[in-house]
Amino acid sequence: SVGFKAGVKDYRLTYYTPDYETLATDILAAFRVTPQPGVPPEEAGAAVAAESSTGTWTTVWTDGLTSLDRYKGRCYHIEPVAGEENQYIAYVAYPLDLFEEGSVTNMFTSIVGNVFGFKALRALRLEDLRIPPAYSKTFQGPPHGIQVERDKLNKYGRPLLGCTIKPKLGLSAKNYGRAVYECLRGGLDFTKDDENVNSQPFMRWRDRFLFCAEAIYKAQAETGEIKGHYLNATAGTSEEMMKRAACARELGVPIIMHDYLTGGFTANTSLAHYCRDNGLLLHIHRAMHAVIDRQKNHGIHFRVLAKALRMSGGDHIHAGTVVGKLEGERDVTLGFVDLLRDDFIEKDRSRGIYFTQDWVSMPGVLPVASGGIHVWHMPALTEIFGDDSVLQFG
């Protein structure tokens, strides 16, 4: 059993409140909690609520200078996970005042910043968040959204088609642009920089931007269709990233790209604001997501990262394929695809949706099916993802 040191109070005395009625303005979280042997589930759930809000390991005199009742997170419900021994879903409600407006960064620092290394827990996973309109309304959200993108591209009633230029590393800028032209001329709507194409010695970013823009304009002139190439603006500093975005705008291209997890939410939100102000679409790649979301018992489920991206801002986001080389369960994938596209998503535990989510008027994000898919997957992909999606081959 875990020994708690002298002077340490049980969290559940303050932070486990099963009678609490959640407020419409609360941010609600569902955690999958695996306590250490001997730690009661109520204590583990309360520990999560405390450590991700106002609590520390003991009582301090400054607690008397504020109203903990107003500011504390509360574990308001705990249920055992069916088929798992000693594993629980702990529901935590956070008062809205704990969070800075319009900052996904602050939201994550608060909710998942400290608790995951907690001694009383063997493992912890954030399964879902309910973002109230009172909070989501403080975010710009996607620069444009699904409908505006279709209007910009003049493409309706079908999924958009794209492919990633390969070999992803090693081509010169001119040969890279040549491949972009061939793909776009052949009928694709989009081509894509690979997520690790930034500005390497064999192909500096400005040269790539120039030759890709040339390829886009040539293909547009010959096909009479609007074409795009996701120019990856991800860089080592956010200033450099903005410089690359500005260059793309000057070239008049329709869309740029960002790796939002490696680049970070602060940089991503800045870029999304720039994209709205300057009429650029923003394609989001989720490089590094599996580090965070792949373990069943620990980390953060991708549906939370997807919701966070919709708030931070992006017009496309990679969302798994269900059919390709990388794993993804169909119902769960469709659950977060709906969370990306729709205004109102009902709670549905069979699809992994723990809370009803109301986005009110925040624009939607197009899910991108990408990773090991080829033409024989088309029937399955269109059935799974429907019209509002990007099918990204190669």
UniProtKB/Swiss-Prot annotation:
The keyword RNA-binding does not apply. Keywords: Calvin cycle, Carbon dioxide fixation, Chloroplast, Lyase, Magnesium, Metal-binding, Methylation, Monooxygenase, Oxidoreductase, Photorespiration, Photosynthesis, Plastid. Substrate binds at N114, T164, K168, R286, H318, S370. It comes from the Eukaryota. One of its GO terms (molecular function) is monooxygenase activity. Its cofactor is Mg(2+). GO terms for biological process: photorespiration; reductive pentose-phosphate cycle. InterPro entries: RuBisCO, RuBisCo_large_chain_AS, RuBisCO_lsu_C, RuBisCO_lsu_C_sf, RuBisCO_lsu_fd_N, RuBisCO_lsu_N_sf. The keyword Magnesium applies. The modification N6-carboxylysine is found at K192. SUPFAM superfamilies: RuBisCo, C-terminal domain, RuBisCO, large subunit, small (N-terminal) domain. It holds the Pfam family RuBisCO_large_N. The record marks K325 as: Transition state stabilizer. The modification N6,N6,N6-trimethyllysine is found at K5. It catalyses: 2 (2R)-3-phosphoglycerate + 2 H(+) = D-ribulose 1,5-bisphosphate + CO2 + H2O; D-ribulose 1,5-bisphosphate + O2 = 2-phosphoglycolate + (2R)-3-phosphoglycerate + 2 H(+). Binds 1 Mg(2+) ion per subunit. It is found in: Plastid, Chloroplast. GO terms for cellular component: chloroplast. RuBisCO catalyzes two reactions: the carboxylation of D-ribulose 1,5-bisphosphate, the primary event in carbon dioxide fixation, as well as the oxidative fragmentation of the pentose substrate in the photorespiration process. Both reactions occur simultaneously and in competition at the same active site. Heterohexadecamer of 8 large chains and 8 small chains. Belongs to the RuBisCO large chain family. Type I subfamily. The basic functional RuBisCO is composed of a large chain homodimer in a 'head-to-tail' conformation. In form I RuBisCO this homodimer is arranged in a barrel-like tetramer with the small subunits forming a tetrameric 'cap' on each end of the 'barrel'. This is Ribulose bisphosphate carboxylase large chain. It comes from Brasenia schreberi. The lineage of its organism: Eukaryota, Viridiplantae, Streptophyta, Embryophyta, Tracheophyta.
